[in-house]
Amino acid sequence: MRFNNYAGAQKMIRYFLEEKDIPQALRKRLEIEQEVIGVMGGNEYPFTYDEALEIMTSHLRDFKKEELDHLKEISATDWIYIDGEVHFQRRFYENLIKTRPDYAKRVITENPEDEKQNHINQNLLNDNIHYMKEHGGRTVHTRIRSTIKAKKEFEEVGRKVRVHLPIPKVYEQVSNVEIHASNPEITYVAPFDAPQRTVYFETELKENQEFMVDYSFDYHVNYVELDPAKVSEEQPDFCLEEQTPHIVFIPYLRELRDELAGDEANPIILARRFYDFVTTKVMYSFMREYFTIECIPEYCAINLKGDCGVQALLFITLCRMSGIPARWQSGLYVTKYYTGCHDWAQFYVAPYGWVFADPSFGGSAWREGDKERWNYYFGNLDIFRMPANSEIQKEFMPEKKWLRIDPIDNQRGEFEYEDHGLRFSQLDVSQKLISMEDIEK
């Protein structure tokens, strides 16, 4: 059993960094470990056992201590030891209510708006599915306003700051990207095809300064019905490589892949088996920051839980291990009711080309008994997206000086001073949909 002696670990790391003559590679590794400990031992797991129990008993009818013990034992709540004491993840309660209907029914003060929003979102998705099937595709013109600023206690007025905010990447789905406004003036706009596209600001920070970009783009998706009988004999060999430390073909994932695949060789059938496994066996779960996880697909396959990106990376890895080209896509899910970060996947099968898989949306549909929506998100996507990233672990243009808040992905932006960067807990970030209109394509 690991008791995570973070205080002792920090002392040892400082000793190696300050007193020992160590290789540069080890120095970099230890500096990253310092950041991981800082996140894990700080904002990510803030609640002690007693505090978690108080949250549960004050929010759920007739909640007992034994229930928290059971949830902890079966890993239904995310927790770790910090210096020998149990600490629960910052969204453990929200995660339980989102993923366990039996506990959601026991909420003492229910928020009718939550149920209303969930119903509205399901209707939006289902209406889009029916439109796509009827018309064969859909195009919208979308306009979004994104902002980022340092929280007051982390604001260092007069110092140089370097700030990145994500914007749409131009490729199959996205065209006609236009920046309408910014504040302050943008220093640099990454190329249209940048794997993680951003606008970059460099300036001296003013009091209460908010960095903003207002942009629009056209977004188009086609509806496809994948037929295994129509698969081409020749398939491409791109997007099949490992990408350490996450897209890696470790023995456990190889065994899982072999178990799911059997003797099947048809890429559509194989990809569907991987999609079915992730959507029916992996429970959706809010996650800690990705850079604190050593291998994301392995975490997903072992713990059978994870959020949208964790599920997408397992699907991508299983596909690549099977000779099916697969890649990452991420950015925002945007509607007039809600805007937030989201990740999904693409896979390539000739003659169809690049098609989509959204395991977390598919899994949600499967748990709700909506078979049509479950099937739809194997091969298809909705219109409510802003894709900013086509790959994981890619540098910005220009690169950040300090360790990124999220070295894997970029959906919220990054903020750094000349001598250190800020964490998400030290920032206020927002994305707002200004408009979304259907257009002819």
Model-assigned labels for residue ranges:
Residues 2-3, 23, 310-400:
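Hydrophobic/aromatic-rich core segments of domains that either
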Residues 4, 191-195, 200, 205-302:
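Acidic low-complexity segments
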Residues 12-16, 20:
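Inward-facing hydrophobic residues that define packing positions of alpha-helical scaffold repeats
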Residues 29-221:
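Intrinsically disordered, low-complexity N-terminal segments that are enriched in acidic
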Residues 267-274, 304-319:
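Active-site nucleophilic cysteine motif
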Residues 379-441:
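Low-complexity, Gly/Ser/Thr/Pro-rich intrinsically disordered linker/tail segments
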